[in-house]
Amino acid sequence: GARWEVLVDAHTGDVLAFQDINQYAKRQITGGAYPLTSTEICPVPTQCGIMQSDAPMPFANTGLAAPNNFAGSAGVFEYAGGAATTTLNGRYIRMVDSCGAINASSPTGTIALGGVNGQHDCATPGFGGPGNTAASRSGFYELNKLAEQARGWLPGNAWLNAQMTANMNLNSTCNAFWNGSTVNFYRSGGGCRNTGELAAVFDHEWGHGMDDNDAAGALSNSSEGYADIAAIYRLQASCVGHGFFWTLNDGCGQTADGTGFNVNESETGLHCATDCSGVRDADWAKHSDNAPDTALGYVCTHCSVSTGPCGRQVHCAAAPVRQAAWDLVTRDLTAAPFGYDSQTAFIVGNKLFYQGSGNVGLWHACTCGASSSGCGATNGYMQWLTADDDNGSLADGTPHISAIFALMKLLSRTITADRVSIRAQSAAQVA
């Protein structure tokens, strides 16, 4: 049985601590999960699609009594005996699979959900229930790890500390969505892979949820930019959902690994990614024209009329935002005067993203045929500067102002007055 230790303040008699001091064994819940994509090969880390057989199932339910009813971040929990059971109804993420229920038990406490490379859609290891699919395991791992990262920057956010449902293997193809409360993913077909087996698609749809539940409590415009940043900053890969376009060819040719077709990001012609079969590539240098997509130069000419920035379609019009965010962590913060390594640059980028995007309304202003600017109070550039500030005043610049200027430089070529002011602040700050 339990042995209890009580710590009492000798002066006041107050109980300071009351705890079980037995040393229990530890057990773990693991399962096979696709890392970035589900292409079944791993040519480079940023396009790795081989199932990882023993991925931890973070914060999974255990079927045990509290306080051991949920595993920790590594899928590990304290075990005193009896059967452990998980349904992937976790502390923060709950999986619901259209293929069926998930239910895996172990009399020894250790639960291995299994799964092997090449299993897709409703295929299972033959145990753990018909919902023990690659999509459910991959989604449970990735969504938990992304939300855990976000809690590190926004510990008081109520949505991040509540449970979110992810619906997997829905009977449709070539898409995924956030519906205001849940994230939802489709099985393979129509020339596309299962969107519930692609890490960046998980992260993107979760990003809409974060956008909807941050400080402002409403989606920014374009929320597609926000969601893409969540994905590319988490995975440190510019291609959003490599492997999405499996056999669907938009005229841009096959990727180097031969597992899919490059995405065409233009709505009015061809604007091809050179090695990305996902839905977008945030690195402008990996596009056929090898040039940044600015608001006036690209969005106004390549995107259809709609409700996004510049009055254009929201996914297409988010190109300058996602490219600026990628530039920040891969070019500006790694160059002089900062010279950060990649890991440090992404840490800075994630801080700015999570702590600086909560009150973004319109990421940047833009009127096609006229001008574009990012200097509005609720524009992304100004909000990220505020998050970067270290003394309560933007008048003397911020620690990374010259790098954050990447959020501005891709938006327009017509904001000379603003640029002069910002560059003067930058020079003073980094000198």
Residue ranges and their predicted role:
Residues 1-202, 206-431:
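Zymogen propeptides/activation segments of proteases
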